[in-house]
A protein has these predicted regions:
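Aromatic- and carboxylate-enriched substrate-binding clefts and catalytic-loop regions
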Residues: 287-459, 793
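Cap/lid segment of the alpha/beta-hydrolase catalytic domain
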Residues: 321, 703-779, 785, 819-828
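Carbohydrate-binding surface patches
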Residues: 511-547, 581-584, 679
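Alpha/beta-hydrolase-fold serine-hydrolase catalytic core, especially in secreted/extracellular enzymes
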Residues: 579-580, 588, 596-685, 690-696, ...
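Primarily recognizes the serine-hydrolase "nucleophile elbow" in alpha/beta-hydrolase
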Residues: 768-834
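Mobile cap/lid helix-loop segments that gate and shape the active-site cleft of serine hydrolases
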Residues: 815-869, 890-898, 906-911
Length: 963
């Protein structure tokens, strides 16, 4: 039977090139053929849809294989991969993918001359919304055709009958890739025929010449196929932005829902900034009327307050092409190109992170061109964009990834406007994941536990579930601060950790309007959310066999909450009327290694020929440490790539062990390691100070150039200490006297590496000490080599960081006050005054070519930054200690770097292995007692394996920077 199946499948695949008159998907399940001048689409031999287009010409010739392979910064899936077969049918270009079709008509005099229409027979179950220029409405289920004007997307269920069917095939109709000179379209129905009609309020294309239509898109398959499809972005133009490193999805506190005029009140804005700071939300949205702020305050004051709290502000604008008279402002600041450039440049200088632009007026060509102008200008000034009162997504989120969300939805704002939303919200919420949200990000503004002008009757767990079910790169949390801060600690932590960009999305169960259960993965953590769209109790099906067992937390319906930690993943979950749940499954921290047995995991990475500096792109934001990484299995290779970049451009190559002969012995309590290369020998000596408590083998803390942490932290702990004497490898004191390279012990072994920076050589030296500990073993050294820590302060803090980053046998790295060139991001230091920056550091430590190539504004060509140096430590533990009293240390830049680096640990569900503590009021390298608890927590957990109740992952004595 299996062989017959394989034979049939092979025949279907062959038919893609051999069967005349029929277009076939790569997997053979989807076909398109011409009958009576109409294109008939079938899925697994079942007719799904008919459409007419262009001249109805026959499908001829061999197809061309089309591949879409790209990465999204936000969306339902990070890495998108799709293949299709492209056919030419006269003026029609037809693509048949495994999950749908896309077609466009070329050589049109204007878009009004397109002749595309779909046939939707009576009896077909359909979820379809009447068109409005803001795309705010419900998707009621119907089976009868009705003349009118309808909005995208349209969801259909076949076979053509009015009953639900387990074998049903679904089709979702929409469009993609609106470019300049085009308008968006909608559907006009006359009986069973739904014509594609561009917005009739404009010329809709060139009056003369030849134009092509946008892609007409039909996603086809099971409900899961429809929900999980990326076809809308697959056919869109690729990203046009050279530098996307500054684009950061995230959660947002939002003033408007509870206070419609709150953005003209500085004190109310402060409440929402404080909420964002408390919950660690990266953004706050200051909405309409900020240009009318009273009390002697201005938007500059509000932005400054947000930045001082470490919160990035977004601000609102009226597009001034839709609702103008009587509408809120600011108005008329973006319409003209020169005004737009001036306004967005002002936003960038002030520290605004993005803009929400509202009140457009439909899908006309002028509006589409205006939207593209706004996106391109915003990108030039590093501004995120949220379109409101505007069209629905049509692929721009791939082409212009600074467009992180779009309204185009009947969302929670309508609790302010109409009483009917209260009774219809639950069913509507259970419809949106199958309709509107399929095609792109949706700014519904979810998670309202309290009431606005009109009450909500959904449960708290239902509201929490919407934050996962509704995909949006900027997820605006609409409720008032006191509502969120009165929730259980578990709920507040959930909101603090909530991702807004997903690696993977799966539909688990559901049916439009009745219920939906969806699972989204971020790194190694799964977020499973479900809601009941009905007014009756309902048990939702949760078959989660694809999720590995892990630490689970379930937020379910209660009064108002039931929060539990299930030992096994539930197969069903009972929900109250209009109820819901969220299940968070984190891979057990023990499932990811705390430390490795080897210096560098061998993943087969081979360094390429690195580009010349002049050929490197300019990146103002911090590069993406997780570029090309979908899950933890890919992280080792990415670590190798980052490490190779840092060595090539920054510190020089750390020699591999291949050509070295290493031997070790104990001389009393002193470890002696001899390293011989080509007849030259370098000797390392370090005395092991054993603890007075506990039994061997002991964990060990290695101090770079000494132990800077207070002695009392180790007195009562079974931890040995030893010192890496860096002068045995590269004598910094001699460099400070003579400023000569190539005159150090290391250079006798490796004379061809005399241009290396000292941090490469010191990292090599500490690794050889660890070699000695491993070679002799715990029976001789009394040291447990699975629990090695490294620490240092100031220049030795940098040394500790490089040593920990470049040797994966180090379980815990504590870098104390490392300053510029350590954890601080070079790019951020460049924007600060009187700090240790790339051109103002000690070049004994780095390659001289780094200063020559990347000083000044050339720092923006650096292909990495030091948040990635920090990230090399992941999945092992890292603690950064700062002191803001010493400006030279550039702790503002370190804080920016730390926050960006922690995203790597967070992606893999182990964010508690990385933290920072920046506290003043003490001397340089003199750890105050107020920081003992953080340091002790890390030592106890990662060197001693103890459970700790206290953990502060992100404490800083100032918040005066913008990431």
């Amino acid at each position: 039977m299996k062989s017959n199946y394989v034979f049939v499948l092979l025949m279907l695949l062959v038919s893609a090139t051999a069967l005349a008159g029929r277009a076939v998907s790569p997997d053979g399940r989807l076909t398109v053929e011409v009958k009576n001048g109409r294109y008939v689409v079938s899925y697994q031999r079942q007719q799904v849809l008919e459409f007419s287009a262009a001249d109805g010409e026959a499908i001829k010739g061999k197809p061309q294989r089309i591949t879409a392979d790209y990465t999204m910064l936000a969306g339902k899936r990070r890495h998108c991969l799709n293949e299709g077969n492209e056919y030419r049918c006269g003026r029609l270009v037809l693509r048949v993918y495994n999950d749908g079709i896309a077609f466009r008509t070329k050589s049109l005099p204007s878009l009004k001359d397109e002749q595309t229409a779909y046939r939707i027979p009576d009896g077909t179950r359909r979820w379809i919304m009447p068109w409005t220029d803001s795309y705010e409405g419900f998707f009621p289920l119907s089976t009868a055709s009705k003349d009118g004007r309808w909005a995208y997307p349209v969801l259909l269920e076949t076979p053509m009958n009015s009953a639900k069917n387990a074998e049903s095939v679904f089709a979702l109709i929409t469009e993609s890739n609106i470019t300049r000179g085009q308008s968006a379209s909608c559907l006009y129905s006359e009986g069973e025929h739904y014509r594609v009609v561009p917005d009739e309020l404009s010329d809709n294309g060139a009056a003369s010449g030849q134009v092509a239509s946008p892609w007409r898109v039909v996603i086809i398959g099971s409900l899961a196929d429809v929900v999980q499809s990326t076809l809308v972005t697959d056919v869109a133009e690729p990203c046009k932005l050279e530098d996307t490193s500054w684009i950061r999805p995230g959660t947002v506190s939002w003033v408007y829902w509870a206070y419609n005029h709150g953005s003209n009140d500085y004190d109310i804005i402060k409440k929402y900034v404080d909420l964002a700071a408390t919950l660690n939300l990266p953004y706050v949205l200051i909405d309409a009327e900020w240009d009318e702020m009273g009390g002697g305050k201005s938007i500059e004051d509000a932005v400054a307050y947000a930045k001082a709290k470490g919160v990035r502000p977004l601000i609102w604008y009226n597009s001034s092409v839709g609702w103008v008279n009587g509408a809120p402002g600011p108005k008329y600041r973006l319409n003209k190109a020169e005004d737009r450039e001036r306004e967005f440049a002002w936003c960038e200088r002030m520290g605004v992170a993005g803009v929400k632009i509202d009140f457009f007026s439909g899908d006309t060509q002028l509006n589409m061109d205006y939207c593209i102008d706004l996106l391109e200008c915003a990108a030039r000034h590093h501004l995120l964009v949220n379109f409101h009162g505007a069209t629905v997504p049509r692929g721009w989120q791939r082409t212009y990834p600074n467009l992180l969300t779009t309204e185009g939805v009947y969302g929670a704002e309508w609790y302010n406007n109409v009483p009917t939303f209260t009774s219809r919200a639950a069913r509507h919420n259970a419809t949106l994941p199958f309709t509107r949200n399929v095609i792109g990000p949706m700014d519904y503004t979810p998670c309202t536990f309290s009431d606005s002008q009109h009450p909500h009757i959904t449960t708290h767990a239902h509201e929490l579930a919407l934050t996962v079910l509704f995909e949006s790169g900027l997820q605006h949390l609409a409720d008032r601060p006191e509502s969120y801060l009165s929730q259980p600690d578990e709920v507040q932590r959930f909101l603090s950790d909530l991702p807004t960009a997903w690696d993977e999305t799966r539909l688990v169960s559901g049916y439009p309007g009745e219920s939906v259960v969806m699972a989204r993965r971020y790194g190694t953590t799964w977020y499973v959310a479900g809601i009941n769209g009905s007014d009756q109790m309902q048990t939702l099906q949760t078959p989660l066999d694809f999720i590995p067992q892990g630490d689970a937390m379930l937020f379910a319906d209660g009064t108002p909450w039931t929060i539990t930690h299930p030992q096994a993943l539930p197969r069903t979950i009972a929900c109250q009327p209009r109820g819901g749940f969220v299940l968070v499954v984190r891979q057990s921290p023990d499932a990811l290694p705390f430390v490795y047995d080897v210096e560098r995991t061998d993943d087969g990475f081979v360094a390429p020929e690195w580009p010349a500096v002049a050929d490197l792109p300019i990146r103002f934001g911090l590069p993406d440490a997780l570029e090309g990484v979908d899950d933890f299995s890919q992280w080792a290779r990415r670590r190798s790539e980052i490490a190779a970049q840092i060595q090539h451009y920054g510190i020089g190559m750390k020699p591999s062990v291949g050509k070295e002969q290493v031997s070790a012995r104990m001389d009393g309590d002193t470890l002696v390691v001899d390293v011989t290369v080509d007849g030259e020998t370098l000797t390392l000596r370090s005395t092991i100070n054993y603890p007075k408590v506990g039994q061997p083998p002991y964990a060990v803390m290695i101090g770079t150039s000494g132990i800077s942490l207070p002695k009392q932290l180790f007195d009562d702990r079974p931890i040995a200490t030893m010192v890496f004497h860096e002068a045995q490898v590269n004598d910094y004191s001699q460099w400070r006297k003579h400023h000569e390279r190539g005159e150090h012990p290391f250079d006798r072994l490796y004379p061809d590496l005399k241009d290396n920076g000292a941090y490469s050589e010191w990292a090599w030296g500490l690794s050889r000490l660890i070699d000695g500990l491993q070679m002799l073993g715990p029976e001789i050294t009394k040291i447990d080599t699975h629990h090695i820590g490294v620490t240092g302060c100031s220049y030795a803090g940098k040394m500790a960081l490089f040593c920990g980053a470049f040797d994966e046998r180090v379980a815990l790295t504590i870098a104390q006050e490392p300053g510029g060139g350590g954890a601080a991001a070079w790019r951020v230091s460049h924007t600060l005054s009187e700090v240790e920056s790339l051109e103002r550091t000690d070049y004994h430590w780095f390659k001289e070519s780094q200063r020559e190539q990347f000083s000044g504004d050339s720092v923006y060509r650096l292909p990495y930054d030091h948040h990635e140096l920090c990230a090399l430590v992941c999945p092992r533990a890292l603690l950064l200690l700062g002191n803001p009293d010493f400006k030279w240390l550039a702790d503002e830049a370190m804080l920016a770097s730390a926050q960006a680096a922690r995203e790597v640990w967070h992606r893999f569900g182990i964010a508690d292995r990385m933290g920072w503590s920046i506290v003043g009021g003490h001397g340089h390298c003199q750890l105050p007692e107020s920081q003992y608890r953080e340091v002790e927590a890390f030592i106890d957990r990662f060197l001693l394996g103890r459970e700790t109740d206290f953990f502060t992952p992100s404490r800083d004595g100032f918040r005066r920077f913008e990431r």
